[in-house]
Amino acid sequence: MKLIIFTGLALFLLVSLIDVEAQNEGACIPHGSVCTTNHAGCCSKLSCDCYRRFEKGVEKGQKCWCIETGVTFSKE
C-alpha cells in the first residue's frame, strides 16, 4: 500500500514539474522574432538587440530582434 501511494505521489510531482517547465519555455520569443526595447521575453541564450533605421539621412524608427547574445551585425 505504501509503495502505491509513494509511486502515485512521485508521478504527480514529475508531471507537475514537466508542466511548469513547458509553461515557462513556451512564453519566450524565438530567434529572429520582433521584441520590444525592454530586453525581456527572448528565449534563453538570446537577447533583444535594437537598431535604428535611416532613409536618406532621416531616422525612420527602431527595430528590435531576438538574436544570439554577443552577436553584432554591421553593414559592409
UniProtKB/Swiss-Prot annotation:
Signal peptide: 1-22
Subcellular localization(s) per the UniProt record: Secreted
Modification after translation: Contains 4 disulfide bonds.
Keyword set, alphabetical order: Disulfide bond, Secreted, Signal, Toxin
Pfam families: Toxin_35 (PF10530)
Positions of the propeptide segment: 23-26
GO cellular component, one term: extracellular region
Tissue: Expressed by the venom gland.
GO molecular function, one term: toxin activity
Family: Belongs to the neurotoxin 19 (CSTX) family. 07 (U7-Lctx) subfamily.
Protein name: U7-lycotoxin-Ls1c
Organism from which the protein derives: Lycosa singoriensis
Lineage, opening ranks: Eukaryota, Metazoa, Ecdysozoa, Arthropoda, Chelicerata
